[in-house]
UniProtKB/Swiss-Prot annotation:
Homodimer. InterPro entries: Adenylosuccin_syn_GTP-bd (IPR018220), Adenylosuccin_syn_Lys_AS (IPR033128), Adenylosuccinate_synth_dom1 (IPR042109), Adenylosuccinate_synth_dom2 (IPR042110), Adenylosuccinate_synth_dom3 (IPR042111), Adenylosuccinate_synthetase (IPR001114), P-loop_NTPase (IPR027417). Pfam families: Adenylsucc_synt. GO terms for cellular component: cytoplasm. This is Adenylosuccinate synthetase. HAMAP family: Adenylosucc_synth. PANTHER family: ADENYLOSUCCINATE SYNTHETASE (PTHR11846:SF0). PROSITE patterns: ADENYLOSUCCIN_SYN_1, ADENYLOSUCCIN_SYN_2. Binds 1 Mg(2+) ion per subunit.
Amino acid sequence: MANVVVIGAQWGDEGKGKITDLLSRSADVVVRYQGGVNAGHTIVVDGQVLKLHLIPSGILYPDTICLIGSGTVVDPRVMLGELDMLIENGIDISGLQLASTAHVTMPYHRLLDQAMERQRGERRIGTTGRGIGPTYADKSQRSGIRVIDLLDEQRLRDRLEGPLQEKNQLLQTIYGMDPLNADEVIAEYLAYGKRLAPHVVDCSRAIHGAARNRKNILFEGAQGTLLDLDHGTYPYVTSSNPVSGGACIGAGVGPTLIDRVIGVAKAYTTRVGEGPFPTELDGSLNDHLCDRGGEFGTTTGRRRRCGWFDGVIGRYAVEVNGLDCLAVTKLDVLDEIDALQVCVAYELDGERIEHFPSCSEAFARCKPIYETLPGWQCSTADCRRLEDLPEKAMAYLRFLADLMEVPIAIVSLGASRDQTIVVEDPIHGPKRALLSA
């Protein structure tokens, strides 16, 4: 048995959905432990493109239990829309389970999120406007609505009365918006609760039951390390903890249950929204990476900012998450570039540093120090074994592995499941006998 956490090692959008889908074949249970509909992942199966925001990738495997954990925030409208889409595509959803203690994104959360972002103007954070931050804020202030509250009308009414009065006052007085009608909100969310009720479970109990039965459990993170509320590029971060430690809190398990942590990183770097990005490119190279890599957000449709691979944040992700190995995605996007640059350090106020600065203002002043590697300028899309890769592509991967001081277990060369090279079984294989110099 092996219990594995999969995390993003950059700013999100690393291709975790595909890697989780690949690893789900060996998993009995897949747990989404944080985030909400602000995250999105795209999976391609037999040429069919499926875009999901809340439902774990493992839903495509009929014998796999997919659990949305207590650390997530759930928008029932989006979740039910995804379930309907899966049913229409002939996918069995009977294995889906939803934590009774997960918090619920209410209509006022979305309205306030969008209004606050507009009010920030040039100081905007770049939120998705889906209400994630306000939902987590209410959770911290102990005034949130949980999934279990949607199953009982009186409990929902009691829980909602105070918060809705407060939110309506904000909407009207501060933002000049119309108030929400309590009876309409209650009726709408009770209807959601009725549809979700068959899937609602005690999250921690379900996971520990699987662990006692020696099941393989895969914990799926959303977003990425540099968007972590505590360890990312604050304030340009999400409102939860995508790092591996967040799996324990968001799923209700202890750290001794985790056997291995796998990081996912693109062969280059992207970021969506605002915030510092030292290796960001402009001009034709940025356009090439964006167009060739299809760098448009699953959730927002926004064009992602693109840049060279940043080994400084890569090493930071290894340390913060305790990575055992790495999956490198979108190597094929670099196929046509003649010279590749990799950031190995920063120049900050005239000094060379090799660590990620905790101060966002200092990070914004960092200039990348690059090493240049030759490109391979031929297609890798059809490579299925490590030895099929061009030597220069192999050299690039070895350089990344050495720079980050972590072995590479998986190389992804496209969106489809079969466009993957598994160097070593990342779950059951030896922890350090993978691709390195």
